[in-house]
């Protein structure tokens, strides 16, 4: 029996218990694989994602997002991963590539040792969450391919239970551009509105002139006055809003708890929430958490965060950055266990390199392919 078949038959049980756990057109990988069979070989390269529309956020505007694509090769199989780096994460192409360049995954001969590999990455550097997420995603893709199963099946999740995903719009000063964004969200059952830029009511009123579709709000830490934040929550509740994400700066936890006690809408932790210990810290100040792979260091910890939040009686939202279908489809593997999804990052870019997650009548549909479920586009 060859190594791949041996792993597929003998390690499946272990994997079920462990974590209820040239590839691009942008040029040659930075570290081309050259190792022998039976060892993990890491390669990576930077790229730039181009946004279909400018994002006008609470603190900045952006038209592109940098990223780094990752692949891990093992015994003839390739696992794909991705690091996306919006400015507030504090990571850059330089920091990610420097971190990845320090890793020596050839010391590992078993790709299922994801916990050990995370411990090794933490020993190399304590931060670098997006960089670690790219490796974690690639490992999950690889191990799922070895087992011949997508991760939602390995976790025992029902793909019929995936939620609707929201589609994101943000304020545009040009009325024609604003209307174009509103028109594009028509096929979706939920719309996420980016707020905190000084035109908060205008964007909702523009949407409500043509649609009563439920909205969720991402305030992007844009409301620093608790009275104003509470007033906005009441105003939004009258306009078919489901919840408000990160209404106040993340360090204003007492003020956020004050708003949460009085708000008619659930308050969701976003920028406040990074890693597993933050879930317990969010309990009491927030009603729900928004898990993103780039903040949680990947799928391994994201699963644990969702389980803990549910045990604490909190709701769970699954989000993403502006990413290709690689990272978004990886996140979608978790979607049957969450209450809300905001998995539209791949729909907001003009140069996706992967085929993966599909949105059918507004609902997340997970591919049945092994691993994270993506295929590299030609």
Feature locations, PLM:
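Metal-dependent enolase-superfamily TIM-barrel catalytic cores that perform enediolate-based chemistry
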Residues: 151-263
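Metal- or metallocofactor-binding catalytic centers and their adjacent structured scaffolds
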Residues: 36-44, 73, 78-146
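Flexible C-terminal active-site loop/helix
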Residues: 13, 35-49, 67, 75, ...
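C-terminal segment of N-terminal export signals and the immediately downstream linker at the start
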Residues: 21-56, 63, 73
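N-terminal export signals
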Residues: 5-27
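Catalytic alpha/beta core domains of metabolic enzymes, predominantly
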Residues: 251-256, 262, 266-268, 272-343
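Conserved, mostly hydrophobic/aromatic
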Residues: 70, 76, 135, 148, ...
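N-terminal secretory signal peptides
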Residues: 1-2
């Amino acid at each position: 029996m060859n190594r791949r078949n041996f792993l597929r038959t003998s390690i499946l049980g272990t994997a079920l218990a462990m974590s209820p756990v040239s590839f691009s057109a942008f040029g040659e990988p930075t570290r081309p694989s050259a190792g022998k069979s039976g060892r993990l070989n890491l390669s990576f390269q930077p790229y730039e994602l181009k946004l279909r529309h400018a994002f006008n956020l609470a603190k900045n505007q952006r038209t592109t997002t940098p990223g780094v694509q990752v692949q891990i090769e093992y015994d003839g199989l390739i696992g794909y991963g991705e690091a996306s780096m919006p400015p507030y994460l504090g990571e850059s192409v330089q920091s990610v590539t420097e971190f990845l360049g320090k890793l020596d995954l050839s010391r590992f001969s078993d790709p299922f040792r994801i916990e050990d590999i995370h411990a090794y990455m933490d020993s190399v550097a304590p931060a670098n969450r997006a960089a670690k997420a790219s490796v974690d995603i690639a490992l999950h893709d690889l191990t799922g391919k070895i087992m011949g199963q997508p991760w939602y099946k390995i976790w025992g999740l029902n793909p019929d239970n995936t939620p609707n995903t929201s589609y994101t719009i943000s304020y545009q000063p040009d009325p024609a551009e604003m209307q174009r964004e509103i028109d594009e969200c028509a096929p979706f059952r939920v719309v996420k509105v980016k707020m905190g830029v000084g035109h908060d009511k205008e964007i909702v009123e523009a949407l409500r002139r043509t649609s009563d579709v439920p909205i969720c709000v991402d305030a992007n830490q844009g409301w620093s006055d608790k009275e104003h934040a509470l007033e906005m929550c009441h105003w939004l509740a009258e306009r078919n809003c489901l919840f408000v994400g990160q209404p106040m700066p993340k360090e204003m936890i007492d003020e956020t708890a004050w708003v949460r006690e009085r708000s008619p809408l659930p308050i969701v932790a976003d920028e406040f929430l990074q890693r597993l210990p933050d879930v317990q810290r969010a309990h009491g100040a927030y009603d729900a958490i928004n898990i993103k792979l780039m903040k949680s260091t990947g799928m391994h910890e994201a699963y644990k965060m969702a389980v803990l939040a549910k045990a604490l009686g909190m709701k769970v939202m699954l989000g993403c950055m502006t990413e290709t279908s690689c990272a978004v489809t990886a996140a979608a593997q978790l979607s049957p266990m969450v209450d809300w999804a905001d998995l539209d990052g791949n729909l907001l870019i003009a140069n996706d390199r992967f085929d993966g997650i599909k949105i059918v009548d507004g609902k997340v549909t997970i591919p049945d392919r092994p691993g994270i479920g993506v295929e590299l586009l030609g």
